[in-house]
Curated annotation (Swiss-Prot):
Glycosylated residues (UniProt): N41
Entry comment on modification after translation: N-glycosylated.
Organism: Homo sapiens (Human)
Protein name: Transmembrane protein 235
GO cellular component: apical plasma membrane; endoplasmic reticulum
Underlying gene: TMEM235
PANTHER family: TRANSMEMBRANE PROTEIN 114/235 FAMILY MEMBER, TRANSMEMBRANE PROTEIN 235
């Protein structure tokens, strides 16, 4: 039973850490980083690179020293007269800001289910909760993957609008917010695997009350 307790404790801690990482990722503004290279020592605007560089999250973008401004609300952009490619970007952004917060809610529900199944010592509930966490990790993975696709398409749309010559000194990368989301996804899958292992361990363990041997049954019958 010590092995079972260790598996359940590790799964609970993994789920809590997964929630914390994903919550920090969703709330932070370092998913996508855009850095502009310096124009050279002879530039008439020495601080140009810092002013044009930016980093953004799911909800807002921060540009240089100008502070952060909210991104365009994808749910309020249906009536805008934009191109098909921009409409596709809006749909992707809408999917991201729905899927990832939904993953947070599902993590809370999964943690509650895991607590109940641990207290009940039920194999079927542990199996259900383990599969639940694995499916939740797939949902988180889908949200992160959609964001990656959204970011690549948004940069390609920007290059198409302004021309490649204006984007030569621009370097884009994903920030630590993305790393937190990947870590949350991995921990969620890890917790689900631990719960499945706990269900398997519990199914192999003998009942707590034990079974009487035939000699014990005969002895009690004689009494």
């Amino acid at each position: 039973m010590a092995r079972l307790g260790a598996l359940l404790l590790a799964a609970a801690l993994g789920a809590l850490l997964s929630f914390a990482l994903l919550a920090a990722a969703v709330a932070s503004d370092y998913w996508y980083i855009l850095e502009v290279a310096d124009a050279g020592n002879g530039s008439a605007w020495p601080g140009r690179a810092e002013l044009l560089s930016s980093h953004s999250g799911l909800w807002r973008i921060c540009e240089g020293q100008n502070g952060c401004i909210p991104l365009v609300d994808p749910f309020a952009s249906e009536s805008l007269d934009v191109s098909t490619s921009v409409q596709h970007l809006i749909l992707l952004h809408r999917a991201v800001i729905v899927v990832l917060p939904l993953s947070l809610v599902l993590l809370v529900c999964g943690w509650i289910c895991g607590l109940l199944s641990s207290l009940a010592q039920s194999v079927s509930l542990l199996l259900f909760t383990g599969c639940y966490f694995l499916l939740g990790s797939v949902l988180t993975l889908a949200g992160v993957s959609i964001y990656i696709s959204y970011s690549h398409l948004a940069f390609a749309e920007t290059v198409q609008q302004y021309g490649p010559q204006h984007m030569q000194g621009v370097r884009v990368s994903f920030g630590w917010s993305m790393a937190l989301a990947w870590g949350s996804c991995a921990l969620e899958a890890f917790s689900g695997t631990l719960l499945l292992s706990a269900a398997w361990t519990l199914s192999l363990s003998p009942p707590i009350c034990g079974h009487l041997s035939p000699q014990q049954v005969g002895g009690r019958g004689g009494d």
